[in-house]
Amino acid sequence: KENSELWFSWNPDQPTDPIDKLLRGKDRIKAVVVEANWKDNPWFPEVLKNEMEQDKKRNYDKYLHVWEGKYREIFEGTVYADEVRKAIEERRFTSLPYDATRKVETFWDIGWADYTSIWFAQVVGNRFHIIDFYQNRMKPLNHYLSTLQNKGYIYGADWLPHDSDKHDPVSGRTYKEVMLGSGRDVRVVPMTTVEQGIGAVRTIFNRCYFDEHKCETGIYHLKRYHYDDKPTPEGLKSTRLPVHDEHSHAADAFRYLALALSDAEPRRKLNYRKRNVV
């Protein structure tokens, strides 16, 4: 109806939440959004101010979310809570331009009904620049190879999981042989336990810098990757493993990245003169 108005009041949680995408997203409808918090309350009581100051000292993430209305960054029971918190404090979720003088390596978790997830990384000295992320499902391998080609990066190795001998449902050939046949430099990450992979991620995470825009979806999944909090039945050995859900695939691909790069030496820039590139 003409001149109708709809009023919403909400506490932001994630930029992917429907209400946020509707009213604050890049394709938002015609809307007026006003951010209001404790600073806008002229009758803000001293008892709440004291509680707020305590939260600020004890749990800064909670303070930002509850009192300042920022998106929630850290979640209870998440696998990489400490690593993510430190990356936020050190501003390692940032803007990372692609360096055309360095090769891009890709790290895959392969699925069909589940997601195929791919991280794109460059080794810059002692740092790992995670410059891009892509995932999709129910797509043939050629779709992903075309996506890589269209990004225009100069590629190094493609790191596949240990089960890369599974067959592409469309071509009937294995992922590994199709990629080798297309001229890709294919490497296979050795099989390890999930715990070993998580340990590798913890080891290298402080060397990782992420492009917060191109890796937004992947970062979201890393933040949400969480342990199963179901109690272990009496008499059984406790096996605290992450839940297998929609966040697992990006996290699995990142484990392969960590395992592949754990022993990476600092990489030099490409010498275009030696490669006869103008």
Question: Which role fits each region the language model picked out?
Answer:
Residues 42-110:
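ATPase catalytic-site recognition across NTP-hydrolyzing enzymes
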Residues 96-135:
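Acidic, glycine-rich loop-and-beta core segments that form the ion-binding/anion-interacting portion
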Residues 9, 36, 67, 118, ...:
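A residue-level signal for conserved active-site and pocket-lining positions in enzyme catalytic cores
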Residues 23-28, 85-89, 95-97, 177-181, ...:
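Short, conserved catalytic or adaptor-binding loops enriched in Gly and charged residues
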Residues 119-243, 262-278:
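Mg2+-dependent endonuclease catalytic cores in nucleic-acid-processing enzymes, primarily RNase H-like
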Residues 244-265:
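Acidic, Mg2+-coordinating catalytic module of metal-dependent nucleases/exonucleases
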